Structures are given as C-alpha cells and as structure tokens.
Amino acid sequence: MYKLIALDIDGTLLNSEKKITNEVFNSIQEAKKSGAKVVLSTGRPLPGVTPLLDELNLNDDGDYVICFNGAVVQEVKSKKILSNIEMCHDDFVLINNLAKENNTHVHINTPTNLIIPEETPNKYTIHEATLNNIDIVSMNEEDINDDITFCKIMIIDEPEKLEEVLENIPKDLFDKYTIVRSAPFFLEFLNKNANKGTALEALCNTINMPL
C-alpha cells in the first residue's frame, strides 16, 4: 500500500480540459480512505490551488501541499509553512536590475500575495493575481527587504521582450538560480535548491514518514 502519493496538477491531475475526471476523483478518495497521504505538487501558491484541494477533499488536518515548484511545503488547513527554500533581498536586487536593464517588469511571489516595486501593476501581474486569487501589493523599492518571504521572483512582460531578457541573462545566473519560462509572458527565478524532490523529502521528514 502506498503511504504517500504526490500528484502534479497539469497533465496528471487535470485532463486536457483542465478538469478532474470521475475516475481520478474516485481514485484519490479511495487512496485517502486507505490511509495514504495525497499531496498536490504545483507551481502555484496555496490560494491558487485551494479550489482543487476543496474539490478533492484534501483540506483536512494532516493534508499537505507543495507550492512554488517545491520552494514551499504547507499544511492545507492551518496554512502553516513546514518547509521554505526561499530567496532573499539580494536576489531581488539582482533580478530587478536585470528587468530594468531590459525595460521589463518584475514581481515577487510570497505565500499570500504578489509584491511589485512600482505603483501600477503590469497586466500580466494582474493575470497572475487573478488566476491564483491573491492580492497585489505595491511597495517602494527601498521598503522591500528580507522581512519578506521571497518564494520566487518573476520577470513578466510581452513574449518578445522576454526573449530579449533570456538572451541577455549572464551565464552565471543559470548556475545561481533555477530559471523557468513557465508561460510566454512569465520568466521565473527560484532558489536552485528548491524542487519537488527536496520538498517531498522535507515533508516526509516532518511527518516522520520513511522515504
């Protein structure tokens, strides 16, 4: 019997119509009844995956979720963060300068919102906030500091502008960060140590489940 089942969302949990089939739903309910932990693993924040967790009844005490492609592990019901492989203010400064040099925009993903270092959000930041049911917070650059939980940092803009950014990224940044073009208008930067494998290991250690 499986003790823990980790599921990606797109292409695994959801079909081509972005829906959960009855077969998948029933399989997850059976697994949960058998005592297995069913854990969704996603690039989204917890608010962005909460509707799916509710639909699948994966919102009880003892249910967990892996967010931001492994950067964050959370308890679903309490929202308590169990593991966080975050970035820092120095990372923001570096990536924000890269965005400025290429005349593009940047936002910071925290567990609960999007932070922008400008007054008016880019349309793609609005798209991300709407998609994930989170607020946009505008801050002055000088007020952004290490009190913020930097889950990931994104450069966002028109696809052709992001192509230029990719061409201009110094090679050493590809060694320093995990850089993902998650959509034509999204370029994500994550801590190099953040991935779904390390997140699962952290979760298993937290709940005393042998790997």
Tell me the role of every PLM-derived stretch:
Residues 3-18:
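Asp-based phosphoryl-transfer active-site loop
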Residues 7, 67, 75, 181-182:
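Conserved strand-loop elements at the edges of beta-sheets that form or border functional pockets
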Residues 17-20, 85-86, 191:
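Short, solvent-exposed loop/turn segments at secondary-structure boundaries
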Residues 20, 45-48, 161-162, 196:
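Short phosphate-engaging motifs
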Residues 12, 37, 80-83, 150-153, ...:
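Conserved short-loop catalytic and cofactor-binding motifs
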Residues 22-123:
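Active-site phosphate-binding/coordination module
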Residues 98, 102-211:
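Conserved acidic, metal-coordinating active-site core of Asp-based
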Residues 2, 60-62, 150:
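Core-facing hydrophobic residues within beta-strands of well-ordered domains
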